[in-house]
UniProtKB/Swiss-Prot annotation:
Its main location: membrane. Keywords: Antibiotic biosynthesis, Bacteriocin biosynthesis, Cell membrane, Membrane, Transmembrane, Transmembrane helix. InterPro entries: HTTM-like, HTTM_dom, Sporulation_SdpB, Sporulation_signal_mat. SMART domains: HTTM. One of its GO terms (cellular component) is plasma membrane. Induction: By Spo0A during nutrient starvation. Repressed by AbrB during regular growth when nutrients are plentiful, in association with the transcriptional repressor Abh. The keyword Transmembrane applies. This is Sporulation-delaying protein SdpB. Required for the maturation of SdpC to SDP. Not required for SdpC signal peptide cleavage, secretion from the cell or disulfide bond formation. GO terms for biological process: bacteriocin biosynthetic process. It is a multi-pass membrane protein. The chain crosses the membrane at residues 27-49, 70-92, 112-134, 155-177, 219-241, 248-270. The gene is sdpB.
């Protein structure tokens, strides 16, 4: 009974209208916007736009309708770019939320996608849809200090946000466990093959620089660290706020590293947005203090080690010159 009363009290003050939710939506929309800005429909449908069909889908995509009514795919792309720009700047979430999901769904279902990011974007934009429909603000960047919605709406908002967190938890847990079933990941050689892959691998100049490391025994350690780190991110769902913040910073750095190494920018941004809504408190605004626990830990540890090393050095020099 006490737990139920505590939960009821928490929900009664629940207020997700902070910049955490706004940054999540904007990054998620921006990732898809980049795909459409830098890839024409000739690339997105390089397998042949004539093969786009609505026969095997429950909900026809925008490109299915375009083909049916002989509308140029580029017109659809430009329209999507316009709508996603509205999503990124935060205009009228109640109106743009549904279009955001439908754009992600259309790209995932009809276009040529290869890295899995669009599928995650489709799922997340669908799960956040009820929240956007309940968001009556003109812009999702307009922060509300208090949430004056009814208790029923607050309850829906709370459970939807919880479901999204569980979904991100499943993504990381599944990624780690599925790797353990794979022979190359279990043996610790998967990173070598992945970085050498002609599609997802490193650019040639980076590969030449990394080859000594990739061909060494240390690659086994690196490969296993990736799996362990993803298990750590999954386990962070039940950790305290300090661990969550450390996991968030490390997770963002991890995906930034992937972006700069193998160039899957949209996927990286999607996962960073997922980490933000997963690990940062939804009811708190993101400030520069959110990463302070990690940097404070590094600073304190570094300072202690510096003092210890410095002290040992002084003792050594004293013995050397004054003994």
């Amino acid at each position: 009974m006490k737990i139920l009363n505590s939960l009821e009290g928490y929900i009664d003050t629940y207020n997700p209208w902070k910049n955490t939710y706004a940054l999540f939506r904007s990054l998620l929309g921006f990732s898809t916007l980049l795909v459409l800005l830098f890839n024409s429909t000739d690339i997105l449908f390089s397998y042949s736009a004539n093969n786009v069909t609505c026969e095997n889908v429950y909900i026809p995509t925008a490109f299915c309708f375009a083909k049916e009514y002989s509308i140029n795919f580029e017109i659809i792309r430009y329209l999507m770019i316009f709508i996603l720009t509205l999503v990124v700047i935060g205009w009228r979430p109640r109106f743009t939320g549904l279009f955001h999901w439908y754009i992600c769904y259309s790209i995932q279902t009809s276009a040529l996608t290869i890295d899995g990011g669009e599928q995650i974007a489709t799922v997340l934009s669908f799960l956040i849809l009820p929240v956007t429909l309940l968001d009556s603000r003109r812009n999702h960047w307009n922060i509300k200090k208090n949430n004056n919605e009814s208790f029923t709406k607050k309850t829906v908002l709370f459970y939807i946000m919880t479901i999204i967190k569980i979904q991100v938890f499943i993504i990381y847990l599944n990624a780690a466990l599925e790797r353990l079933k794979n022979k190359e990941w279990a043996e610790g050689t998967a990173i070598y093959y992945f970085f050498s892959d002609p599609v997802f691998g490193l650019p040639e100049y980076q590969l030449n620089l990394m080859n000594p490391l990739l061909e060494s025994n240390f690659i086994v350690v690196i490969t296993w660290l990736v799996t362990i780190f993803e298990l750590f991110l999954a386990a962070s769902i039940i950790s305290n706020i300090r661990i969550k913040r450390i996991a968030l910073v490390l997770g963002i750095l991890f995906h930034i590293g992937i972006i700069f190494s193998i160039g899957i920018v949209s996927f990286g941004l999607i996962m960073i947005s997922a980490l933000i809504i997963y690990l940062h408190p939804v009811q708190q605004n993101i400030t520069m203090n959110w990463c302070s626990p990690l940097f404070k830990y590094i600073y304190v540890k570094g300072k202690r080690n510096f003092k210890r090393i410095g002290g040992e050095s002084v003792k050594f020099l004293t013995k050397l010159f004054h003994s």
